[in-house]
Design a protein with these regions (language model features):
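Short, charged, low-hydrophobicity "junction" segments
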Residues: 21-25, 91-102
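Solvent-exposed, non-transmembrane alpha-helical starts
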Residues: 131-137
Length: 162
């Protein structure tokens, strides 16, 4: 009888230890996932903010290079549409009318992250001037920004100003 009590006690202690270990492991995994999620959200917010500002910032003398550099942060159909728009509208207009545009991000929020796809909202202040209208015009811009992670980099796959 004594041996069976000892065996029952040992099994009970073992069960408690296993349950405790499982609980600790579960908390550790959840904590690691939360850190990865927070880091991913930070990466998405940074990519959305930096790219949004780059899309809306240029000077007449550097517009082609500025827009090319911004295009390197894009992907998919949006990259092709953006390239065509800048080549046919932004670059010639900036050079002809001496348009300078500077965009500063005022706020960024990540709406969702699902694997390698994310959506963010970016709010910017854009200051634009031309030779014909040298007094700067300030505009508040909000945009929904879709991003896709490719080879570890978050690239903008769509940019919809509102």
């Amino acid at each position: 009888m004594r041996g069976s009590r000892l065996m029952a006690w040992c099994l009970g202690v073992l069960a408690v230890l296993l349950a405790s270990g499982a609980a600790v492991l579960s908390v550790a995994v959840d904590d690691a996932q939360a850190r990865v999620s927070a880091q991913t959200r930070d990466d998405v917010a940074q990519a959305a903010a930096e790219t949004s500002a780059a899309l809306l910032t240029y000077t007449p003398d550097t517009v082609a290079a500025d827009q090319y550099a911004a295009g390197e942060r894009l992907t998919g159909d949006f990259r092709a549409r953006y390239g065509q728009f800048t080549d046919t509208v932004v670059v010639p207009t900036s050079r002809t009318n001496r348009v300078t545009s500077t965009a500063t991000v005022t706020a960024t929020g990540v709406s969702s992250v699902d694997g390698d796809d994310a959506e963010a909202l970016v709010f910017l202040t854009q200051v634009t001037s031309t030779d014909a209208a040298p007094d700067p015009v300030t505009t508040k811009v909000g945009a929904r920004v879709d991003l896709t992670r490719i080879d570890g980099r978050w690239l903008v796959s769509d940019f919809e100003p509102s």
